[in-house]
């Protein structure tokens, strides 16, 4: 492609158009959710997704009480529990008024990108294309196969707020860690539904000891982490705060869509098997040259999901590490079935984080 033809081509791309529409009002809030994209610094253009959620808090709405009763699945809460800061913070995201048809503008690498109108659930998903050279300006990502592209939302004049987002631009080779959340890095007690709801809505999140340090040691050497969980997007702010507070490495989040208006809170407890298979499959297909470590727990169906994916992607999946909370054995009926045709040396049951491989041990699995 000649320089003239390239310039003409770039000028026709959507991101090159003047972007001005921004419907954000002062009573609306936006959450920018981390995303990822395959990155090749030798490519002329880089394609990457943006993900935003726009809503208006409705804490004093008439239907709040009924929805809260649904949300807690009939668990009797004391007045003190209902008024606790933890419960109010966690439950408020389920009670917001999701804003449909709102348009936002993102500032990315000196470009203004007009995002499409939000959907009924308040979410906006947009695929952007920018010149790779613009993403690398000012030395960003120098000497790194993978790095984080940061961006912001444009706010109306006089609005003092700032909304900041991240896109993980990930190189073709290296290690990717796919991690479950509940009972893998955070104590949830998923198998006891009453305890699960209390740990989710009433108690401070408690980390699984040692997991943050182990993940950090991997990321320090260049690994990228993807948190894939059956939790709903409404818990993303709390989960992101939790991972930051207890010093888990930052990464992308992959959670389920859920609206209390569309069903019941019992849908929150539905097995996430199909969702996890689809989300992780996308990661594997996006990065065919990367090696993957899957980390989960035995409380639900992580062994079965990970085993199925390992059979589909034999060369990529080099470790399946399962936190053993149900007294499993690798040679019992369940694990034998879950890991059928998966090399035994790639399967690990662990009780404590120090049983997970060090970075040097992980590299030996390449």
Please give the residue ranges for each predicted region.
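Bacterial N-terminal signal peptides that target proteins for export
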Residues: 1-8
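Intrinsically disordered, serine/threonine/proline
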Residues: 19-166, 355-366
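Short beta-strand edge segments in extracellular beta-sheet folds
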Residues: 166-172
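Asp-based phosphoryl-transfer active-site loop
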Residues: 175-188
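Short, acidic loop-to-helix structural element flanking the phosphoryl-transfer center
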Residues: 201-224, 233-237
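Short, surface-exposed connector motifs at secondary-structure boundaries
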Residues: 217-226, 285-292
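C-terminal cap/substrate-recognition subdomain and adjoining C-terminal extension
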Residues: 231-366
């Amino acid at each position: 492609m000649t320089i003239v033809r390239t310039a003409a081509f770039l000028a026709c791309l959507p991101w090159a158009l003047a972007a001005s529409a921004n419907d954000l009002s002062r009573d609306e809030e936006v959450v920018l959710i981390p995303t990822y994209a395959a990155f090749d610094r030798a490519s002329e253009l880089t394609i990457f997704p943006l993900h935003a959620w726009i809503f208006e808090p409705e804490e004093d709405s008439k239907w709040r009480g009924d929805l809260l009763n649904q949300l807690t699945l009939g668990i009797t809460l004391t007045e003190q529990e209902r008024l606790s800061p933890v419960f109010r913070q966690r439950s408020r995201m389920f009670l917001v008024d999701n804003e449909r048809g709102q348009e936002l503008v993102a500032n990315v690498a000196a470009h203004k990108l007009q995002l499409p109108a939000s959907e009924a659930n308040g979410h906006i998903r947009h695929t952007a294309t920018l010149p790779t050279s613009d993403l690398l300006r000012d030395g960003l990502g120098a000497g790194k196969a993978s790095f984080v592209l940061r961006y912001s939302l444009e706010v109306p004049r006089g609005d003092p707020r700032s909304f900041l987002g991240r896109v993980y631009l990930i190189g073709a080779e290296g290690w990717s860690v796919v991690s479950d959340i509940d009972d893998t890095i955070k104590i949830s007690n998923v198998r006891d539904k009453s305890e699960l709801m209390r740990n989710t809505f009433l108690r401070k999140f408690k980390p699984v000891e040692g997991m943050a340090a182990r993940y950090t040691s991997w990321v320090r050497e260049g690994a990228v982490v993807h948190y894939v969980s059956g939790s709903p997007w409404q818990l993303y702010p709390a989960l992101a705060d939790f991972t930051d507070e207890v010093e888990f490495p930052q990464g992308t989040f992959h959670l389920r869509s859920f609206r209390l208006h569309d069903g019941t809170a019992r849908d929150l407890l539905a097995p996430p098997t199909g969702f996890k298979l689809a989300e992780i499959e996308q990661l594997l297909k996006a990065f065919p040259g990367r090696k993957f470590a899957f980390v989960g727990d035995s409380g639900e169906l992580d062994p079965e999901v990970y085993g199925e994916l390992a059979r589909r992607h034999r060369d990529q999946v080099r470790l399946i590490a399962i936190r053993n909370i149900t007294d499993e054995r690798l040679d019992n009926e369940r694990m034998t079935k879950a890991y059928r045709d998966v090399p035994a040396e790639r399967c690990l049951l662990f009780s404590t984080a120090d049983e997970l491989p060090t970075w040097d041990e992980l590299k030996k699995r390449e």
